[in-house]
Protein backbone atom coordinates (compact mmCIF):
# COMPACT_ATOMS: atom_id res chain seq x y z
CA UNK A 1 0.00 0.00 0.00
CA UNK A 2 1.21 3.48 -0.90
CA UNK A 3 0.15 7.09 -0.45
CA UNK A 4 -0.48 8.78 -3.75
CA UNK A 5 -3.03 11.05 -5.40
CA UNK A 6 -5.80 10.68 -7.95
CA UNK A 7 -7.56 13.17 -10.20
CA UNK A 8 -11.35 13.36 -10.29
CA UNK A 9 -11.93 13.35 -14.03
CA UNK A 10 -15.65 12.81 -14.51
CA UNK A 11 -18.86 12.48 -12.49
CA UNK A 12 -21.75 10.40 -13.78
CA UNK A 13 -25.05 10.46 -11.91
CA UNK A 14 -26.45 6.94 -12.24
CA UNK A 15 -29.76 7.40 -10.41
CA UNK A 16 -31.17 9.08 -7.30
CA UNK A 17 -29.10 6.78 -5.08
CA UNK A 18 -25.60 6.64 -6.51
CA UNK A 19 -23.06 8.39 -8.70
CA UNK A 20 -19.93 7.06 -10.38
CA UNK A 21 -16.72 9.01 -9.92
CA UNK A 22 -14.01 8.41 -12.51
CA UNK A 23 -10.49 8.78 -11.15
CA UNK A 24 -7.30 9.22 -13.11
CA UNK A 25 -4.63 7.33 -11.18
CA UNK A 26 -0.86 7.38 -10.97
CA UNK A 27 1.37 4.39 -11.65
CA UNK A 28 1.45 3.56 -7.93
CA UNK A 29 -2.19 2.44 -8.16
CA UNK A 30 -1.99 0.73 -11.53
CA UNK A 31 -1.72 -2.71 -9.93
CA UNK A 32 -5.03 -2.50 -8.04
CA UNK A 33 -7.23 -5.56 -8.55
CA UNK A 34 -10.91 -6.41 -8.01
CA UNK A 35 -11.58 -6.77 -4.30
CA UNK A 36 -9.11 -4.12 -3.20
CA UNK A 37 -10.16 -0.64 -2.10
CA UNK A 38 -8.94 2.89 -1.39
CA UNK A 39 -8.76 5.12 1.69
CA UNK A 40 -9.45 8.69 0.64
CA UNK A 41 -8.86 12.16 2.06
CA UNK A 42 -10.34 14.89 -0.10
CA UNK A 43 -8.15 17.73 1.17
CA UNK A 44 -5.05 18.27 3.26
CA UNK A 45 -6.95 18.96 6.47
CA UNK A 46 -6.94 16.31 9.18
CA UNK A 47 -10.61 16.68 9.99
CA UNK A 48 -12.23 14.26 9.87
CA UNK A 49 -9.34 12.10 11.00
CA UNK A 50 -10.64 8.88 9.44
CA UNK A 51 -10.34 8.55 5.69
CA UNK A 52 -13.32 7.64 3.52
CA UNK A 53 -13.44 4.05 2.29
CA UNK A 54 -13.98 3.97 -1.49
CA UNK A 55 -14.73 0.81 -3.46
CA UNK A 56 -13.90 0.64 -7.18
CA UNK A 57 -16.60 -0.90 -9.34
CA UNK A 58 -14.60 -0.78 -12.58
CA UNK A 59 -10.84 -0.96 -13.00
CA UNK A 60 -9.27 0.21 -16.25
CA UNK A 61 -5.94 1.31 -17.61
CA UNK A 62 -4.86 4.39 -15.63
CA UNK A 63 -8.37 4.95 -14.32
CA UNK A 64 -10.82 3.70 -11.72
CA UNK A 65 -14.54 4.18 -11.34
CA UNK A 66 -15.83 4.22 -7.78
CA UNK A 67 -19.45 4.22 -6.63
CA UNK A 68 -20.49 6.91 -4.16
CA UNK A 69 -23.79 8.15 -2.67
CA UNK A 70 -25.62 10.55 -4.97
CA UNK A 71 -25.92 13.30 -2.37
CA UNK A 72 -22.18 13.91 -2.05
CA UNK A 73 -20.54 16.61 -4.16
CA UNK A 74 -17.32 16.10 -6.09
CA UNK A 75 -15.62 18.47 -8.52
CA UNK A 76 -13.89 17.29 -11.70
CA UNK A 77 -10.34 18.60 -11.78
CA UNK A 78 -9.76 18.20 -8.04
CA UNK A 79 -7.01 15.96 -6.72
CA UNK A 80 -7.63 13.65 -3.76
CA UNK A 81 -5.16 12.03 -1.38
CA UNK A 82 -5.20 8.23 -1.65
CA UNK A 83 -3.90 5.32 0.40
CA UNK A 84 -4.04 2.08 -1.51
CA UNK A 85 -4.50 -0.46 -2.72
CA UNK A 86 -5.96 -1.70 0.58
CA UNK A 87 -6.40 -5.43 1.16
CA UNK A 88 -6.09 -8.42 -1.12
CA UNK A 89 -7.92 -9.30 -4.30
CA UNK A 90 -10.78 -11.73 -4.88
CA UNK A 91 -9.81 -15.38 -5.23
CA UNK A 92 -12.05 -17.62 -7.28
CA UNK A 93 -12.38 -21.37 -7.53
CA UNK A 94 -11.12 -23.15 -10.59
CA UNK A 95 -13.73 -24.10 -13.17
CA UNK A 96 -16.12 -21.49 -11.78
CA UNK A 97 -19.38 -21.61 -13.72
CA UNK A 98 -21.87 -19.77 -11.54
CA UNK A 99 -21.26 -17.06 -8.95
CA UNK A 100 -23.81 -16.10 -6.31
CA UNK A 101 -23.48 -12.61 -4.80
CA UNK A 102 -25.44 -11.70 -1.66
CA UNK A 103 -25.95 -8.16 -0.33
CA UNK A 104 -27.74 -8.20 3.04
CA UNK A 105 -29.00 -4.90 4.47
CA UNK A 106 -26.26 -2.97 2.64
CA UNK A 107 -25.32 -1.81 -0.84
CA UNK A 108 -23.63 -4.44 -3.04
CA UNK A 109 -20.95 -1.93 -4.11
CA UNK A 110 -17.90 -3.78 -2.66
CA UNK A 111 -18.80 -6.86 -4.73
CA UNK A 112 -19.27 -5.18 -8.09
CA UNK A 113 -15.65 -4.94 -9.23
CA UNK A 114 -15.57 -8.69 -9.88
CA UNK A 115 -18.43 -8.59 -12.39
CA UNK A 116 -16.45 -7.57 -15.54
CA UNK A 117 -13.88 -10.31 -14.89
CA UNK A 118 -16.56 -12.96 -14.36
CA UNK A 119 -18.40 -11.94 -17.52
CA UNK A 120 -15.16 -12.06 -19.51
CA UNK A 121 -14.63 -15.62 -18.26
CA UNK A 122 -18.22 -16.56 -19.21
CA UNK A 123 -19.22 -17.14 -15.60
CA UNK A 124 -22.93 -16.65 -14.93
CA UNK A 125 -23.76 -14.28 -12.07
CA UNK A 126 -26.74 -13.97 -9.75
CA UNK A 127 -26.98 -10.97 -7.41
CA UNK A 128 -29.49 -11.31 -4.57
CA UNK A 129 -30.44 -8.10 -2.75
CA UNK A 130 -31.73 -8.91 0.72
CA UNK A 131 -33.51 -6.77 3.30
CA UNK A 132 -32.82 -3.06 2.87
CA UNK A 133 -30.45 -3.86 -0.01
CA UNK A 134 -33.51 -4.64 -2.14
CA UNK A 135 -34.01 -0.89 -2.70
CA UNK A 136 -30.72 -0.68 -4.63
CA UNK A 137 -31.43 0.19 -8.26
CA UNK A 138 -29.67 -2.07 -10.74
CA UNK A 139 -30.47 -0.71 -14.21
CA UNK A 140 -26.82 0.26 -14.68
CA UNK A 141 -25.51 -3.28 -14.12
CA UNK A 142 -24.61 -5.45 -17.13
CA UNK A 143 -27.52 -7.38 -18.62
CA UNK A 144 -25.67 -10.63 -17.93
CA UNK A 145 -26.23 -10.20 -14.18
CA UNK A 146 -29.40 -11.87 -12.90
CA UNK A 147 -30.85 -9.72 -10.10
CA UNK A 148 -33.18 -11.16 -7.46
CA UNK A 149 -34.79 -9.50 -4.45
CA UNK A 150 -35.36 -11.07 -1.05
CA UNK A 151 -36.47 -10.33 2.47
CA UNK A 152 -34.58 -9.57 5.66
CA UNK A 153 -35.24 -13.19 6.63
CA UNK A 154 -33.02 -14.31 3.71
CA UNK A 155 -35.96 -15.62 1.68
CA UNK A 156 -36.29 -15.20 -2.08
CA UNK A 157 -38.01 -16.95 -4.98
CA UNK A 158 -36.36 -20.17 -6.18
CA UNK A 159 -33.82 -19.96 -3.36
CA UNK A 160 -33.08 -23.69 -3.39
CA UNK A 161 -32.29 -23.62 -7.11
CA UNK A 162 -30.19 -20.46 -6.83
CA UNK A 163 -28.04 -21.91 -4.06
CA UNK A 164 -27.80 -25.28 -5.78
CA UNK A 165 -26.37 -23.73 -8.94
CA UNK A 166 -23.73 -21.67 -7.13
CA UNK A 167 -20.13 -22.86 -7.33
CA UNK A 168 -19.05 -20.03 -5.04
CA UNK A 169 -20.76 -17.39 -2.89
CA UNK A 170 -19.55 -13.93 -1.90
CA UNK A 171 -21.55 -11.92 0.64
CA UNK A 172 -21.47 -8.38 1.98
CA UNK A 173 -23.56 -7.26 4.96
CA UNK A 174 -24.30 -4.10 6.91
CA UNK A 175 -21.15 -3.31 8.90
CA UNK A 176 -22.80 -2.58 12.27
CA UNK A 177 -22.89 -6.31 13.16
CA UNK A 178 -21.15 -8.30 10.46
CA UNK A 179 -20.65 -11.44 12.53
CA UNK A 180 -24.38 -11.71 13.29
CA UNK A 181 -25.41 -11.27 9.67
CA UNK A 182 -22.72 -13.55 8.26
CA UNK A 183 -23.86 -16.16 10.80
CA UNK A 184 -27.41 -15.90 9.46
CA UNK A 185 -26.16 -16.41 5.91
CA UNK A 186 -24.04 -19.35 7.06
CA UNK A 187 -27.01 -21.07 8.71
CA UNK A 188 -29.29 -20.37 5.75
CA UNK A 189 -26.86 -21.97 3.32
CA UNK A 190 -26.17 -24.80 5.77
CA UNK A 191 -29.89 -25.64 5.80
CA UNK A 192 -29.92 -25.85 2.00
CA UNK A 193 -26.69 -27.78 1.45
CA UNK A 194 -25.29 -31.01 2.82
CA UNK A 195 -22.16 -29.11 3.84
CA UNK A 196 -20.39 -25.79 3.38
CA UNK A 197 -16.91 -26.67 2.09
CA UNK A 198 -13.88 -24.46 2.31
CA UNK A 199 -13.35 -21.99 -0.53
CA UNK A 200 -17.11 -21.78 -1.12
CA UNK A 201 -18.65 -19.06 1.08
CA UNK A 202 -16.78 -15.78 1.51
CA UNK A 203 -17.69 -12.76 3.59
CA UNK A 204 -16.47 -9.30 2.66
CA UNK A 205 -15.77 -7.33 5.84
CA UNK A 206 -16.05 -3.53 6.04
CA UNK A 207 -14.74 -2.44 9.47
CA UNK A 208 -13.48 1.05 10.19
CA UNK A 209 -9.87 1.28 8.99
CA UNK A 210 -7.89 4.07 10.69
CA UNK A 211 -4.56 3.13 9.12
CA UNK A 212 -5.13 0.63 6.30
CA UNK A 213 -1.64 -0.78 6.79
CA UNK A 214 -1.98 -3.29 9.62
CA UNK A 215 -0.49 -1.03 12.27
CA UNK A 216 -3.47 -0.23 14.49
CA UNK A 217 -5.28 -3.62 14.49
CA UNK A 218 -8.66 -1.85 14.59
CA UNK A 219 -9.95 -4.05 11.75
CA UNK A 220 -9.10 -7.38 13.40
CA UNK A 221 -11.24 -10.39 12.45
CA UNK A 222 -11.38 -13.40 14.77
CA UNK A 223 -10.68 -16.69 13.04
CA UNK A 224 -11.17 -20.22 14.28
CA UNK A 225 -7.38 -20.31 14.57
CA UNK A 226 -5.99 -16.93 15.54
CA UNK A 227 -6.84 -13.55 14.06
CA UNK A 228 -6.43 -11.64 10.81
CA UNK A 229 -6.59 -8.01 9.71
CA UNK A 230 -9.13 -6.90 7.16
CA UNK A 231 -6.81 -4.24 5.72
CA UNK A 232 -3.93 -6.62 4.98
CA UNK A 233 -5.41 -10.14 4.91
CA UNK A 234 -8.95 -9.28 3.81
CA UNK A 235 -11.38 -7.78 3.23
CA UNK A 236 -12.67 -11.13 1.98
CA UNK A 237 -12.47 -14.15 4.26
CA UNK A 238 -13.51 -17.78 3.85
CA UNK A 239 -16.31 -18.04 6.42
CA UNK A 240 -15.32 -21.62 7.26
CA UNK A 241 -12.26 -20.03 8.89
CA UNK A 242 -14.05 -17.15 10.67
CA UNK A 243 -15.26 -17.47 14.26
CA UNK A 244 -18.98 -16.81 13.82
Language model feature labels by segment:
Residues 74-209:
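FNR/FR-type flavoprotein reductase catalytic core
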Residues 40, 81-83, 221:
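A generic structural signal for residues embedded in beta-strands
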Residues 2-78:
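Ferredoxin-reductase
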Residues 45-55, 86-98, 231:
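Short, Lys/Arg- and Gly-enriched loop/turn segments at beta-strand edges
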Residues 189-193, 213-214, 224-225, 235-244:
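Nucleotide-activated chemistry modules centered on ATP-dependent adenylation/adenylyltransferase
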Residues 204-235:
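Local cysteine-cluster metal-coordination motifs and their immediate loop/turn environment
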Amino acid sequence: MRQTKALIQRIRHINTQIQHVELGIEEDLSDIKPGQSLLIRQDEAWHPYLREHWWPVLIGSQKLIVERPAGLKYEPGNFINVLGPVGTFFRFRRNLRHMLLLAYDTLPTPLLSMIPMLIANQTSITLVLLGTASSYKTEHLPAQVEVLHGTGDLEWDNRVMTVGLADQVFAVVRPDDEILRFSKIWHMLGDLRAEIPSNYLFGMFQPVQPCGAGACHACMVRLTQGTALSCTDGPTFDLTQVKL
